[in-house]
Amino acid sequence: NFQIRDEETFSLCIPTDRDYKILQLTDLHLGFGMFSGKKDKLALEAVTELIHRTEPDLMVLTGDSVFPFFPKSGTMNNRKQAEKLLAFLDGFQIPYTLVFGNHDCEMGSTCNKEQLAEIFTTGKYAVFTKGRYEHSPQNPITGVGNFVVDLTDDQGKLLLPLILLDSNMYGDGWFFSGFDRIHEDQTDWCMEKL
């Protein structure tokens, strides 16, 4: 029961007759490569157990879902990683959304963030859009995947807005520069949306 209202806002109808459960998953670092098979299997088993145990209404992946870093995963193909992750998540038939972390697109990976975002929009249960981003035709802001998921009741009344922001990658785009952050133009956009 979700629909996109505009390029940066989803509306997701939630049940009001019981508690609504959101499962947060972070830093899965799925590689789906020649060096990460055992680790990936353990991570997917743990996620499956969490989903069955908690029976969430929405899953929120908060960065570093995939890890296209050859020394750890044995591949730089984050396109394949994203497609496998979507197939896995869609199998549960539960809506999910996500934000990027610093490892989802490493230097030399197959897809940049905009390309990876296009893949994530194709998930059957994905509540995801590129939203307002660095190369938006109008009013660009830092990052990719800055958007809102408005949780509403069955009458369309807003119960809770979830603001999703790209925390970006590295300070100057390179691994050794240190982690980036949420930028002021992103927080300004948040204030506009609220």
For each feature predicted by the language model, list its residue ranges.
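N-terminal active-site segment of His-dependent metallophosphoesterases
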Residues: N1-R79, K84
